[in-house]
């Protein structure tokens, strides 16, 4: 029978339609023939059988319709075998058949396959794949070093198919097995039901072989299996088919976990994390590739088994070394930032290079671009932490354990020495970037309960912060992962041991972790920002001076300025990402609410409305670390300096901050640390609207804050709290308290000025003054009286110091202009320059502060008079005002005429105006005017005449000049009368004179301890500042003083006699 006849017979067979092609049917017949031949060889020859008939059947290859039909029914499995062969070829792209492609049909077989030659030789005549040899075939395929060299065409198509070549010749075996897995999945959806188990088995073979590859990667030459796994995931993320890869990985992971005899699961997977660590550490914040790798890690932190390996992998070699955490995979991620990698080294820094050559708009665009990446970056870190916290109790404990240990190991970042020794600091502790990013992620975790009315917020249990050291098992049971918090100073001393619960909730842990992270990170960076800002200002001034003098140092100074500006812009950008700031503000406002609720004794989960007077129950504050309040203040001050728009857009939440400031600023019972309470005054100054801001032509930049501040319902309590802390910081017990108090009071002056301009606050201040006027003789001097006394003390000291420094500057400037410094050695000249610069800084500080104190006295005296004209305050304020006028308008003013007043914030015109305003405010009181001439040290009629001349010169209003002239005349008349009286009483005996002031006593009193008699006004004034007997330092209060009635009568009799004698002489 000819081939054509055979083909015709087969094609007319109705069963031939079950085959994919005519060639498949012929192949089936060939296989069947081979099997029949094998069966005939195995059976013994029978004499009854006809050898000729069998031989003819085999040799003639008779493809008659009847014979094929009978064979198909008898050997149906042969058809199934063909289909299995084709399916295996389609899935694994391998074959044992290298026959002419023209004899194969293109239907159901891939166009290109890897020919497994060695296996084909081993199997001799079998050129098909089945379920018994497929595993061997896959293994053989995986061992091929270059499968592309073994590709053959399976079809007769002459068209070049690069995709088929690439798929079949895939060299990377992990990627190859994944592709096989995908093709097997596809087959499962297409094959008929009888082939389905075989398709599933092929799918399982891809998984089991992948498991083998991962367990024994050393078998496969030139194959980095773990690199391939990472690259496969990376490609999937970038190609949006990541779910397909993770489905494959899930099954591989499950297979690996079933048998860990060869290698444990962590041993298999740790190389993957090694690769990720190596790649991520070289990436920058603004590189897109970084976020693909983070997505890989996000999957790992969602997958329970990989998450456990990840937590094991990120454990540092030395848990007590804070810097070691930065070297872990999570630490490397947290260290990515726009901050400088090596502090001070701007070379190779990718951000804000040569800022002076960039326009403000270009810098703003770069900043916005970085912020976009930062927001995405922080979201990824947050999701990783959230995944681990939610995945299982084991992973939750693991990540909290890591965070707690990390913070404890880095606790030294806040030490003073750490900032002074950077070379040691960066060997011991993780970086600023690390803590800034960690803080941003933890802030996101806190947002669900960072709402002022959140019931979850009040479930925070402060006793968490005072638990003593626990072992690891106890930490796990109690959910306490922070270490060392019990060594932190709390808001108030503990009176009794707290009752500790069995365990703590996640809100408590999250708040404690986040607040401490901010304390270690954001807080420190803020300090650095302030210093950088100051250094920039100094460099700018020095650079400008060098340019003006054509100094060769100008170029060097410009380079320094450029470098520092790069550091400044990088740091500012890192700290001002809008979403991070908003999240932090939400947390700090919530912390203000929480602390207020603890301060009024609320131990429930629902907030209690604030009311005054405050209740007594506040013992829980003894378990709250001071850094909780310090963070709150520090952040709001930061916003005022570097991101004030957020304060305005979030103004409604600031009322909660005002509640916090009102309660804690004035309450030593609730916040013992006077330094921290003084800082709250700076916080108040930060959040209040500022008078000196230029409003936008379209909308006021302080409108909302002004509304909140003016409508604050507890204005009287806030005013009193501010004045109380002003007084309290006079005596902090700190060895540097004298210098500190001026810095602490600096922000209080603008607050007082703003309060005075608002009706509710001004009336509250006047009420305090009225109370003081009525209780001058109280055992404890009234608050406002002590405040005024300290205010005048400050004014006297500050302006006097400013005058001294200006005089020294004037002398040094004259010496320099005369060329006297040119003859000095370079070192001596540098010392002179440094001295002049130091005097300038000191003069500027004292001038600023004295301007504020005199200005405050100026507006207070406009409506508060009775206290100022009282004898024991009047004398002091008059002597102060006259002394300053003497330097500002008298002959001594020449000594203060430095080159540039503005450089030192010296404002003599404003000072003269304020002093005259005080005089005019109090000049209506006859007693006050009568006291002015008693100032024998500075007062003279000439002084006031000189003052009038200066008022005219500085163009003050005419009505003010006239009023002051009239006041001067009245005082001169009183001075003349007093001079006559003094001449009359000049020979008073020592017994009648005050031992401190050497003036005639009008109200002699006896001090109980020393038994010394002094004038009542003198001792009253002394006790405002120092509640001790001035003669023996024994404790003393006004109620202990007794009038010396007998001496008073003697003085009055003597005065009457002297007066009578004078009248008789006249």
Curated annotation (Swiss-Prot):
Principal location listed in the UniProt entry: cytoplasm
Annotated segments matching region Disordered: 35-57
EC number: 2.3.2.27
Listed PROSITE patterns: U_BOX (PS51698)
Cited InterPro entries: Ub_conjug_fac_E4_core, UBE4, Ubox_domain, Znf_RING/FYVE/PHD
Catalytic activity field: S-ubiquitinyl-[E2 ubiquitin-conjugating enzyme]-L-cysteine + [acceptor protein]-L-lysine = [E2 ubiquitin-conjugating enzyme]-L-cysteine + N(6)-ubiquitinyl-[acceptor protein]-L-lysine
Coiled coil: none
Keyword Acyltransferase: no
Gene Ontology terms: cellular component: cytoplasm; nucleus; ubiquitin ligase complex
SUPFAM superfamilies with a match to the protein in the record: RING/U-box
Modified residues annotated as N6-acetyllysine in this record: 386
Record's keyword terms, sorted: Acetylation, Cytoplasm, Transferase, Ubl conjugation pathway
Entry's free-text remark on domains: The U-box domain is required for the ubiquitin protein ligase activity.
Protein task: Ubiquitin-protein ligase that probably functions as an E3 ligase in conjunction with specific E1 and E2 ligases. May also function as an E4 ligase mediating the assembly of polyubiquitin chains on substrates ubiquitinated by another E3 ubiquitin ligase. Mediates 'Lys-48'-linked polyubiquitination of substrates.
UniProt-listed PANTHER family: UBIQUITIN CONJUGATION FACTOR E4 A, UBIQUITINATION FACTOR E4
Protein name: Ubiquitin conjugation factor E4 A
Organism encoding this protein: Rattus norvegicus (Rat)
Gene: Ube4a
